[in-house]
Amino acid sequence: MIRKCLVLFLSFALLLSVFPMLNVDAANRPLAKIPGNSNPLMDHKLGADPYSLVYDGRVYIFMSSDTYVYNKDGSIKENDFSALDRIQVISSTDMVNWTDHGTIPVAGANNKNSGRGIAKWASNSWAPAVAHKKINGRDKFFLYFANGGAGIGVLTADTPIGPWTDPLGKALVTHSTPGMAGVTWLFDPAVLVDDDGTGYLYSGGGIPNESDPASIANPKTARVIKLGADMTSVIGSATTIDAPYLFEDSGIHKYNGKYYYSYCINFAGTHPQQYPAGEIGYMVSDNPMGPFTYKGHFLKNPYTFFGVGGNNHHAVFNFKNEWYVVYHAQTVSKAQIGAGKGYRSPHINKLVHKEDGSISEVQGNMTGIAQLSNMNPYTRVEAETIAWQAGVTTEPTQASGGPISNLNVTNIHNGDWIAVGKADFGSAGAKTFKANVATNVGGNIEVRLDSETGPLVGSLKVPSTGGMQTWREVETTINNATGVHNIYLVFTGSGSGNLLNLDAWQFTPNTGGNTITKVEAENMKIGGTYAGKISAPFDGVALYANADYVSYSQYFANSTHNISVRGASSNAGTAKVDLVIGGVTVGSFNFTGKTPTVQTLSNITHATGDQEIKLALTSDDGTWDAYVDFIEFSL
């Protein structure tokens, strides 16, 4: 997973030359992901050793937490991998617009992650692998990670983005695990859940003796071991995978009933032509435990495509009936400092299986994958959903109404911008644009089409909200936004500091009616002793006892609304859910029976401004549970 890359020392003056002073009359330029391209997947942060998880129409990419490390003079060091104690997560439905889900603070030994580390025994979290499996009818997610080269740990969650817990309190696999002796580097996990629900964990790497040609040619340090039904235990002994010229980076996928084990070929010694150094080779078997037979290679070293090399790390996945490979390359760091220095970023390109089962050579490039579907601008869009950007970063937020591990866009200066690809405004077009913002000084958000200097269709004045985590929804009118366009939000304002933070945004359609605001229960704050997420009869939240609730903050310009909630009871009884706005109970929803229904409370009056909306139990008699799907109303 970790190899040294080209060392290039930069002076502080040169570093500053890469970041010229902003011309306040012009928008900033993107760093590495250029509008129209899909690679790298993001350039506002780094991410290495990518692994994919496809779930519920989204692809999630989990990555090691590459972070710039600095010399005393302010120049960027060569990556020493000391910051790999967290896991980065992003996701997308269309392969262009990626939502930043922040970091998972995995390693917890020696007060790592400021004491928030989940695995208190682990000092590192390298090269994640992720799997989904239904256990006892419930969706469960499993995050495997390497504690350096000493073993593999596992975390579990009920959603792909957490919250994550450590079910074991120790490593799942170590050198003491049967069959794991002799593995030089016990890291770089990959995981397969087969069609029958059985899980398999692949790992390993390294050359036992780099001065021995036989050891270089057949390191025999890759392993596969069967997982227990709970995915957090192992069964039996690990089996050796005799991958020729193995270096690291286990990968696994299944295609047409065959099992494909793939890996990074090592750099040591002299290789026969069929084992090119630093490329991704692959083997095929009829059994997930092997034996595997070497068939060839399909992904060249990143240097071939981008002029900056280093190790090769990949994962193969199928998304919406097409095959892809995600891999890392040092393209963002090259764009920022002129050299990779070992700092990596995720890329995706298409992968093709030929009729005979062999894999075609993948063409790595900055173009990437064309957007798979248009975006709907009339639903809430998290601001950290970004196709392209200039100047911004993201941070954890206190704003409500977003997903678990919600972020906001920050570090916003005059001329910075964010953009999303291919939003479909329809023939009627947009009427208004609203955004959830927080700011001390205020500023403006220009809404432009197709470029940062494209047609201006609206301008949103952002007043001071009284704090950078004091949130308020503001709105403006939109003109001449119809059809399919890329949307650019360009930030303007005075001063040299952070102008504002942006949590989410949404357009309203120009149909003559009011916009519909819909908030999913599973994205709200969950409170009470027993409340928890459910996946049946819908993805939502179960309220099991009095004082259980879900809530979020909503800005109201008007004081009267019709408010609808979709819900159900756990049985034939009637589940009563109170609607509380601003601390005042304004009505109740009564859901009878297990079939979900939408109920509406009409002409509800309440206070204006920022108000807490809460759906709560106060009259539970112990004979029923309430299931809540979403709340919906017209602004």
From Swiss-Prot:
Activated by calcium and magnesium. Inhibited by copper. It catalyses: Hydrolysis of terminal non-reducing alpha-L-arabinofuranoside residues in alpha-L-arabinosides. Substrate binds at residue 311. Ca(2+) 1 binds at residues 382, 384, 406-407, 503. The active site is at 49 (proton acceptor), 248 (proton donor). The record marks 188 as: Important for catalytic activity, responsible for pKa modulation of the active site Glu and correct orientation of both the proton donor and substrate. It comes from the Bacteria. Residues 379-508, 517-634 form the CBM6 domain. GO terms for biological process: xylan catabolic process. Residues 1-26 form the signal peptide. Ca(2+) 2 binds at residues 520, 522, 539, 629. Pathway: Glycan degradation; xylan degradation. InterPro entries: CBM6, Cellulose-bd_IV, Galactose-bd-like_sf, Glyco_hydro_43, Glyco_hydro_beta-prop_sf, Glycosyl_Hydrlase_43_Enz. It is an enzyme of class 3 (hydrolase). Its EC number is 3.2.1.55. Optimum temperature is 55 degrees Celsius. Keywords: Calcium, Carbohydrate metabolism, Glycosidase, Hydrolase, Metal-binding, Polysaccharide degradation, Repeat, Secreted, Signal, Xylan degradation. Belongs to the glycosyl hydrolase 43 family. This is Arabinoxylan arabinofuranohydrolase. It comes from Paenibacillus polymyxa. The gene is xynD.
